[in-house]
Structures are given as C-alpha cells and as structure tokens.
Amino acid sequence: MRIALINSQQDVGGVNIKNHLQTLLAAGGRWPLAEQHELTFYEVAGRLIHQDRIDEEVDADLILFISRHASVHPTPALTVHVTGNYEGADLGGEPGRLAPAAPAWMHAILGNLAARAPEGYRVSYEVTHHGPTALSTPSLFVEIGSTATEWADPAAGRAVAESILAAEPQETIDLLGFGGTHYAVRQTEIALSSRGAFGHMVPTRQIGAVDPVLLRTMQEASGAVAGYIDRKSLTKDDAGRIERMLGDAALPLLSESEIQEASGLAWAAYLRVRELAEEIAPGSRVRIHDLRGEGTPAVVRIGPGLIEETIKSDRSGFLKGLDELPVAHLSKGSNEVLSTFICFENESSRLASDITTLCVKLLLICENAVIDGDHLVLRKVRFDPEKARRHGIPKGPLFAMLAGGKAVEIEGRMVTPDAVQTTSVKRIHIPGLERYI
C-alpha cells in the first residue's frame, strides 16, 4: 500500500510528528508501516483543513494527516478522526460532505496511542468534523492537542510517530457511531477493548442532522457493517429514530456487549449466528460465550427442564461454565437462558454433552439430588408459610427464624423447621445419564 504522510508548514504539532517520524525511520529498526508499505512525506504551505482534492496530486492509497489539535477546553490529548461536515463548513471542506474513512487504521493507531501516550495525555477518537472533505482516498487525522506546549512536546511527537509506524491493522468490525461528546468517550472505550472500529461518528449535538440519506452516506464512506448508539447520551426519541433508520438500511444495531462478544468471531459467522437465533427464537437476544473463529452455526437442544432447574439452582455457576465453552445461548423476555444453544456444526455433539455435564454436576452439588438409572431426581425442601400459620406462627421474628431453619417456641410448644416444610420431587430424564457424572 502507498501511504502519504502530510503535514502543514505552519502547524507546529504536525512538524513535531513529522520530525520524529523521519528520525525514527533514519535510525532503522523494524517498523511495520515502513516494512509493509511505501511511505511518502508531503508538506503543504496552507492549513490541512483546506486541502480538498489533495489526493489528485498525491499518489497514495491512504493519507495520514499529522496535525495539531486545538480546543476551547484545552487539555493534553492525542486523537484520531476522519473528516467531514454534517452541516455547515466553518472549518474547511464542503457542507454535508464526508471524506472516505479508514476505520481499521484509526483503530490500530488509537490502540497504539493508548499504549504509548505520555503521562497526563488523554487518548481518544474525535467525531467527524472539519475539512478536507473532497477526497476520494481514505484518510485520517492524527493529532497532538491542545495548546502550543503540547504541540511542541517531543514526548508527544515521538509517541504519535511510534504509534503510526507501529500500526498493523487487523480484521475489524467497522461501525458507525451515534451520540456522545466530541471526544466519543464510549466509542473510544469500545475500540480499545474490542475489534469494534469506528468510521464516521455523529455527536449528540448534531444528531438532528441524521436522515436516511446522510446515514447511507456515512455507511458508504466508512464501509460500516453495523451501527452503535450511545443511548445514555440521546433522548429516547432520537435513539429510536436512529435505530429505525439503521434497520431500514439493513445495518445491524449492536450494543457495547454485543460488539465485545462478536470480536472473537469472523463477522460473517457472527451474522449467521444472529440469523439462526432469529429463526429458532424470534426476538431473542444472543449472548456469545467462547465461540470463536468461523464455521457453520448449528443448533444444540437440551431438555428445558434440565436448563430451568440448573438456572434456579446456580445461575452464576451455569453462566460461568458456559463462558468456557464454544457456544452461544439465547434469552427472551423473562427467560434468561433458553434450552436451545448455538455452536459450530463440527462441535455440536460434544457441546450437547458438555452442557448436559455442566448441568448435572451443578445440580448434584447444589441440590439434594440422586441418580436413579437414567433419571436425575431432585428433592427440594421448602419453607411453607401456610403450614407455619397453621401452627400458630405469626408473621414476624418467629416466622423468619423458622424460615431460616431454626426451631421456635410459641405458647409452650416447640415448632421445628421440618414441621413447616414442604418437599417436592422432580424427575428429569437424561438418556445415558451415567456418561455425564
């Protein structure tokens, strides 16, 4: 890939970064950007935000603009973002135009900045803003902010230069972002902890500008496969409006947890898992556990009674056990774990056995359970409030003591816990039960 690194002569921050890039390259060392790509430096006289159509003069597949960052609330910061104007063009570019984004490159550089930032520097995305916008080549800005002190800081310049040279984009989940501040706090945290890579992002203050045409433009300019909404930063009406537009554009809406869970799967495999979940349990939510890579999704069905009793007995233990298995579970409404699971086809037989084994072991530990041939027999003893009332026990301290398993005295009579208990027995048929013990 041919990569152009462009700075402005009048931009102290950009010159700082450029000088450190050239120094590091001259010193040798193994830098992925230099080893894997063809690098060219360009310096312009004017401000970078006014460099519309510079890609017509620069022969490159990717443009990295290296620059200073200014803010009305100055704080030491290292940022990355793509350019564009959702509305007016007060800072270069054209109104309503978005430049092509490079989400995977921004993701890679953002992660490197977080690892290399000097003490006291905040690392974040910035939402889409300013020019240039009239570009055909994917580009991004990498910036030092926010005052002359930071622009000239050699530690910041070196950190940014190293972050650029060390960039090795991986397979990412390219996303659109909606809501939040200028510094895209939630989107930054997601990107730093997952494969979620944001292209164009709209802050809360400009969310009213989003319509179906703009959303489609954002998607095309970002190569996005899904969207993320920072719901806490938007009104319910605005969030709902964006969600409907994403649906109309056939772009999945992912929550933060779904982005995290999807990060271990090939994107096509994740989509197939979601589609299969919708087929077998419409409206259900998918939770991915240790399902990774790619494969053909398949359904694993476990007896609903076994799953239900396991959840009642040890919910956290069951979910923790699932976290160690290459499986996804479904939930719907008040039913936290449906009895239908999804795994890859080549592991379906093993997963059916592993999930059954997990359930049986948890029930044998947590419940008064015995094995009777191919049946797991659960004997449950419960405090019975009606029996307590028949023994003359009023609600209050004595009631609570009996419920807690302690004998009580009332009117000269001792009432023991077993006198106010009800026993129920449930038999769960598990063919070949001895294999799961």
Swiss-Prot record:
Catalytic activity: a D-aminoacyl-tRNA + H2O = a tRNA + a D-alpha-amino acid + H(+); glycyl-tRNA(Ala) + H2O = tRNA(Ala) + glycine + H(+)
Entry EC no(s): 3.1.1.96
Molecular function GO labels: D-aminoacyl-tRNA deacylase activity; zinc ion binding
GO aspect biological process, one term: D-amino acid catabolic process
Protein origin, superkingdom: Archaea
Cofactor: binding details: Binds 2 Zn(2+) ions per subunit.
Requisite cofactors: Zn(2+)
Disulfide partners: none
Keywords attached to this entry: Hydrolase, Metal-binding, Zinc
HAMAP family on file: Deacylase_DtdA
Family of the protein in this entry: Belongs to the DtdA deacylase family.
Function recorded in the entry: D-aminoacyl-tRNA deacylase with broad substrate specificity. By recycling D-aminoacyl-tRNA to D-amino acids and free tRNA molecules, this enzyme counteracts the toxicity associated with the formation of D-aminoacyl-tRNA entities in vivo.
PANTHER family: D-AMINOACYL-TRNA DEACYLASE
Subunit structure: Monomer.
Record's protein name: D-aminoacyl-tRNA deacylase
Organism annotation: Methanoculleus marisnigri (strain ATCC 35101 / DSM 1498 / JR1)
Encoding gene, per UniProt annotation: dtdA
